[in-house]
Regions:
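Segments forming oxygen-rich coordination pockets for charged ligands
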Residues: 1-140, 147-153, 157, 171-174, ...
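ADP-ribose/adenylate-binding Rossmann-like module
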Residues: 138, 175, 180-183, 192-218
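Short, charged/polar "capping" segments at the starts of alpha-helices
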Residues: 143-147, 211-214
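Short, well-ordered alpha-helical microsegments
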Residues: 121-122, 186-187, 212
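Short amphipathic alpha-helix with an adjacent loop that forms part of the alpha/beta core around
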Residues: 162-172
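Adenosine-phosphate binding glycine-rich loop
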Residues: 206-282
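A short acidic, amphipathic alpha-helical/loop segment
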Residues: 127, 188-193
């Protein structure tokens, strides 16, 4: 974390930081004092998260408790990954002053990188677009990465699986789904992702239990950090009993929503249990 403690930001400085963050596909939260002592009204700080996950604190409030609370709120808002997350929070400082903070977050559009342009990739691409992802589809077969097969994709890239991500940015804002036509391609792509200095926001791989176990053994033998290996979602997706490509795509998309929105995956009917609460007298 980088702390640039230079006093509060002006409105112009905060606006410039938002513009810069958007230009570099970085997430940023602005925290503004809307109610409090007159000298503090309109003061701002910003907390920016770079693509490698580094936090940069820009500006500072004079009151230490207020400043710490503002930074904490900004971090929580950034962790939510929700663009234009708006909320207010009250803070009472040691001196007894009460402040109201307005928190506004901007996050870049998440990118879904589908590795492998087969049958699952087509419905997953369409679903990803509907969920607000910029979708990139990559494959080493030119006839598969076509506009006709993926009319809604933002990018279609023919690659060499020995260096599949040379034109793809790996960041916390990147969601990688490995659904290639063969284990060796999935493994090579996975190995490259895990050896990258910057962690992806999500890495999921399709496959049977046997195939995934073999993949993990290979990664351990390649001396990949076990912590990085543990972050792989494999088999990817939620257990919906999916069988068709479209159903599997929905199961994968559901996991992406679950993780990005920090859900629990429990059916709402089970959580609310309306019948038992209101109609079951036993």
């Amino acid at each position: 974390m980088i702390d640039q403690n230079t006093g509060p930001l002006s409105a112009e400085e905060a606006a410039k930081e938002v513009i810069l963050a958007r230009e570099h596909a970085e997430a940023i939260t602005i925290v503004l004092v809307t109610i409090g002592p007159s000298k503090a009204l309109g003061q701002r700080i910003a907390v920016k998260r770079s693509q490698d996950g580094t936090l940069n604190i820009l500006g500072a409030f004079e009151d230490k408790k207020l400043n710490n609370r503002a930074i904490s709120l900004a971090k929580s808002s950034l962790d939510s990954r929700r663009s234009e997350d708006l909320h207010k929070s009250e803070v009472t400082t040691v001196s007894g002053q009460t402040y109201t903070l307005f928190v506004e977050t901007y996050v870049p559009e998440p990118e879904l990188i589908i590795v492998g342009a087969g049958h699952i990739a087509q419905p997953l691409c369409s679903t990803g677009i509907m969920l607000g992802f910029k979708v990139t589809v990559i494959d080493d077969r030119k006839k598969f990465v076509t506009q006709a097969r993926f009319p809604d994709a933002h990018r279609l890239i023919e690659v060499d699986f020995n260096d599949p991500f040379k034109d793809v940015k790996i960041s916390l804002n990147s969601y990688f789904v490995l659904v290639t036509r063969g284990h060796k391609y999935d493994f090579e792509c996975l190995r490259i992702l895990l050896k990258n200095d910057v962690e992806a926001g999500y890495i999921g791989m399709i496959g049977s239990r046997r195939r995934i176990r073999a993949t993990f053994i290979q990664l351990v033998n390649d001396q990949i950090d076990p912590k990085r290996i543990s972050q792989i979602k494999a088999p990817l997706g939620l257990d919906l009993g999916a069988e068709t490509p479209a159903e599997i795509a929905i199961a994968i998309a559901a996991e992406l929503v679950l993780l990005s929105r920090k859900g629990d995956g429990i059916p709402l009917s089970q959580k609310e249990n309306i019948f038992k609460r209101f109609f079951d007298d036993t």
